[in-house]
């Protein structure tokens, strides 16, 4: 298993009802990525898709991916926290699980690690 130093929280910066297939298509076709952007993607009903195995690196935050777990919720279009209660519950469940497994890991938001503190 990789050494996990960060648990990074994200929003898709899109509508809460985005289709996962559209998000994946954006990564592949627009950004040219051959890996997914997150380990977990949480829909507005609180269901979560495990997109990338924990043992694998994904494209969450440049420079931090080798040692991070990335958890994202669908939403956050206007830069505000648009999580539903169900998304908050699932995110807390996932973060709690990972923090138990990797107690040394820092919990941060994507913007805390990006150079301009905005992307």
Question: What would you call each of these model-derived segments?
Answer:
Residues 1-39, 51:
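Cell wall/extracellular polymer interaction/catalysis modules
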Residues 1-12, 44-48, 53-54, 64-67, ...:
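Basic/polar, cationic surfaces and motifs that engage anionic cell-wall
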Residues 22-24, 63-66:
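Surface-exposed beta-strand edges and their flanking turn/coil or helix-capping segments
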Residues 40, 71:
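Divalent metal-coordination and catalytic microenvironments
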Residues 57-61:
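Flexible, surface-exposed loop/gating regions in the mature catalytic domains
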């Amino acid at each position: 298993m990789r050494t996990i130093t960060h648990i990074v929280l994200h929003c898709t910066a899109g509508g809460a009802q985005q289709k996962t297939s559209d998000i994946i298509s954006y990564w592949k076709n627009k950004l040219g990525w051959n890996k997914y952007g997150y380990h977990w993607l949480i829909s507005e009903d609180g269901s979560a898709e495990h997109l990338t195995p924990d043992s694998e690196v994904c494209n969450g935050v440049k420079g931090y991916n080798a040692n991070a777990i990335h958890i994202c919720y669908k939403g956050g279009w206007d830069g505000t926290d648009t999580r539903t209660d169900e998304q908050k519950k699932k995110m807390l469940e996932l973060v709690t699980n990972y923090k138990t497994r990797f107690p040394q890991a820092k919990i941060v938001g994507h913007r805390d690690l990006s150079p301009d503190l905005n992307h």
